[in-house]
A protein has these predicted regions:
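A glycine/threonine-rich phosphate-anchoring loop and its flanking beta-alpha core
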Residues: 16-18, 132-225
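Short glycine/serine/threonine-rich phosphate/pyrophosphate-binding segments
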Residues: 126-132
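Conserved small/polar residues in nucleotide/adenosyl-binding loops
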Residues: 275-277
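ATP/NTP phosphate-donor binding region
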Residues: 1-118
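Acidic, metal-coordinating catalytic segment for phosphate/diphosphate chemistry
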Residues: 267
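Conserved, helical-rich catalytic subdomain that frames metal- and/or nucleotide-binding sites
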Residues: 228-248, 253-256
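Conserved phosphate/pyrophosphate-binding and hydrolysis machinery centered on Walker-type P-loop NTPases
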Residues: 259-262
Length: 277
């Protein structure tokens, strides 16, 4: 069974960026990676990258590759099935290393992938950053798609092409501008987030409202209870507004030399300012 998005829009990149567009697609209900990626015959090599926190949320998809219990899989682990490979890494910022980026590259190399392959990150900003960076290097650049699983990655981290990893004690020191071809968004992933991660994502939402969207500001003011209870319809509206605002900013300032730099602020004061209103 194929799955159809309930909404979509295009992020168009500047002519001089070297990139065309990112298709951003929204889906309803529970995440259905099997229908998205496994329902039709596939002849393309694909590398799916996720982590030990996300694997238990995608048990049907994981069981396509292995009989191991998704809760018990150790990182790093590699599983192969037909033309597809699954790479499971450790979860969290401490795993955002060049070693794990190279683990992704190595998984593709050991699977004998060609330049027509596809990398897919299923996770938050750490996963999309590393997978996008690995895709930019493998065979001098292969296609990449993101399935964001956190509010922060839905509204910010997965959109716009910034990829990379930490190096020694330096955060995001190495990387590349390399946008995804497609971003597939299920707001249902947000229901499983720990409260602190959900609040962190709200910081980006508050910042976007303050900088770009009176409509979003009004939603945050008048529907706070629905926001905090993670109402799916309200979340979809919030994510859509934020994603479109981020897309517009990226189009105007792809290499982060002007207005886009403002998007780096707000992770600290945003959550506090909203949750204490």
């Amino acid at each position: 069974m194929n799955i159809s998005p309930i909404d979509n829009f295009e992020l168009l990149f500047p002519d001089n960026s070297g990139f065309d567009k990112t298709d951003i697609l929204f889906y309803s209900g529970k995440n259905d990676l099997c229908s998205l990626y496994l329902s039709a015959e596939n002849k393309r090599n694909r590398l799916f990258v996720t982590d030990t926190n996300i694997a238990p949320l995608c048990t049907d998809f994981i069981s396509h590759f292995t009989d191991e219990n998704a809760d018990n899989i150790k990182a790093p682990s590699i599983f192969k099935k037909g033309n597809d490979t699954l790479c499971i890494l450790g979860a969290g910022e401490k795993y955002k290393t060049i070693e794990n980026v190279l683990e992704i590259v190595r998984a593709a190399l050991n699977s004998n992938f060609n330049r027509n392959c596809l990398f897919v990150a299923i996770g938050g900003g750490v996963l999309s950053d590393m997978t996008g960076f690995a895709a930019s290097m493998f065979k001098r650049g292969v296609d990449v798609e993101f399935v964001p699983t956190t509010l922060l990655s839905d509204v910010d981290a997965s959109i716009g092409g910034k990829t990379g990893c930490d190096f020694d004690s330096y955060k995001n020191m190495i990387g590349a501008f390399y946008p995804a071809k497609k971003i597939h968004i299920w707001s249902s992933f947000i229901q499983s987030l720990p409260q602190n991660e959900f609040i962190s994502g709200l910081g980006e939402v508050v910042k976007t409202a303050f900088l770009f969207s009176p409509e979003l500001t009004e939603i945050l003011k008048t529907q706070k209870e629905k926001v905090m209870s993670r109402n799916e319809e309200v979340l979809k509206k919030i994510i859509t507004i934020c994603a479109k605002a981020k897309a517009k900013t990226v189009h105007e300032d792809f290499k982060e030399k002007g207005i886009r730099a403002y998007l780096n602020y707000g992770h600290t004061f945003g959550p506090v300012s909203y949750t204490h209103l």
